[in-house]
Amino acid sequence: MINGFELSNHARFQMQERNIQPLWLTTTLSAPDRLLPLADPRGNTHYLKQISDFGDRWLRVVVNPNVSPNRVIILFFDRRLK
């Protein structure tokens, strides 16, 4: 659990596979640069943060807000954002 958010097994795997630092995830969840509630058809919330330590790329963290605790279901560096 990070900052009150539960991580799905897929999210844990993606963190390791993509070398996403726990600090980047914590910062994105606690102080996102952009917050997109209901950003997809499943009603998930997308948290976005520009990570200076990773070439100013944007980290997108997708959270299911309909479960308790809220669950991080996927996270990735979004190449669509500049």
Feature-to-residue mapping (PLM):
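Ribonuclease/tRNase effector modules and their secretory precursors
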Residues: 1-82
